[in-house]
Design a protein with these regions (language model features):
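Positively charged, small/polar-rich N-terminal and surface patches that mediate targeting and assembly
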Residues: 2-133
């Protein structure tokens, strides 16, 4: 039994690391954070950003005249690095929470992560993603 547990820990430590970046509307952040926490995501970085996609932002007017060109809209960027939670699970949760069927629901980007280093302890890889930091 102990041998199986060690094999599982070794597999987790050598597991592929992935970074999921979600760009979405600010008002969806709290609900998404709660949903991700329920599936075991216990860390993320959130940044206030601006951007536009298909919706091209809202129309801007200056002294009653429409100003051409897209307007940057406020969004949030959520960054998550995982090893033990399947990327597909995180993507599914994000899609369920963010979907309205309207333009501007957001985007999800998935990247491979080569390495991670915890500065305080020097731990790398899987171990750097564990613990209280």
């Amino acid at each position: 039994m102990l041998h199986v547990a060690r094999q599982m820990m070794t597999a987790a430590r050598t597991a592929k690391m992935s970074k999921i970046v979600v760009i979405c509307k600010q008002e969806k952040l709290a609900v998404l954070q709660s949903a991700l926490n329920k599936i075991g995501v216990n860390g993320m970085t959130v940044t206030q950003v601006q951007g536009y996609g298909t919706q091209k932002g809202n129309s801007q007017y200056y002294r009653g005249v429409r100003v051409d060109g897209p307007k940057l809209l406020p969004k949030v960027k959520i960054e998550i690095v995982v090893t033990s939670i399947p990327v597909e699970t995180i993507v599914d949760v994000c899609k369920k929470v963010l979907y309205t069927g309207q333009i501007g629901d957001g985007k999800i980007f998935i990247y491979d992560v080569e390495e991670v280093v915890k500065v305080r302890t020097g731990e790398t890889g899987y171990d750097a993603l564990q613990g209280d930091d």
